[in-house]
């Protein structure tokens, strides 16, 4: 089957990781793919067998980038002549080409809604515009996919989409890569990590969706009391310079380390450095609609996990420590660092592999597509 996949964002977005993972699995199962997106770097992603990859350079001038991406997506779509189109996010640079291709070739178009993107903006023109896109584009698609029950209810109640047009496609993980990963000395050397260091990872965007401003004061106090602890902050974004300056002002730049953007293929090896993974999301409507890839990857890597019950975190309640407030995190992290329970870690890995491994999630999705 020939499938055109249109990513509204760039290769460095968390949503893009989900979409690219689906693309790789579709290609692995023998389908012919053309994958298009905006790209922050010149060459975009690492190439993958079976995927024709194209990207348009992201300049930071959003209206221009969106306009150029819309045109390139349409041109490549016309040339590729897909049997169906899979779109990430209800944005014009993906939805307009998909709708035109549907009108021209009469094929099926599918839209993945994985966030309430407009809720991350303050009241104003941009928020209203993105909300308009959310209300306008989804009704024209043959199928809507989503990964969170709260978000699914929003799509039904607020966007007026029939439940029969919605397919629940969980957030998956490339579990085999995390299960097979080994400690890589290069990463230890890169960040000056010693064998007896107690490493904690916090992986998240440091852009407009970030909640790190709530986490940083807690980490400051925590590392001040435990001299062997080092924090790896994995991620990048527009607010990263602000957070780096705060850490330097605290004098903790050798204890709280910012890795910057990492290629997602590096994550299994980087997580092998750590004992504990933490995830905090403020209890907002936007965050309630999320399905954390971080929690899934932490568990797949065998880490102890401390998080709060926002998004779909409670689905992992038997394998993580849930804290209702940020003030509970230090005690929970300290306890997790002292725990030695490899059997529980293996049970968590099996749970993630059984329920959130991309091969069977994509197989089920394809079966549904063939029936619809």
Q: Which positions does each model-derived feature cover?
A:
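Conserved donor-binding/catalytic core segment of Leloir-type glycosyltransferases
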Residues: 4, 145, 193-210, 215-219, ...
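A short helix/loop element that forms part of the nucleotide-sugar donor recognition site in Leloir-type
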Residues: 179-193
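Nucleotide-sugar-dependent
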Residues: 13, 210, 263-270, 275-299, ...
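A charged, aromatic-enriched C-terminal amphipathic alpha-helix characteristic of glycosyltransferases
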Residues: 338-370
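Carbohydrate-associated surface elements
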Residues: 150, 172
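Nucleotide-activated donor-binding/catalytic signature segment of Leloir-type glycosyltransferases, i.e.
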Residues: 241-268
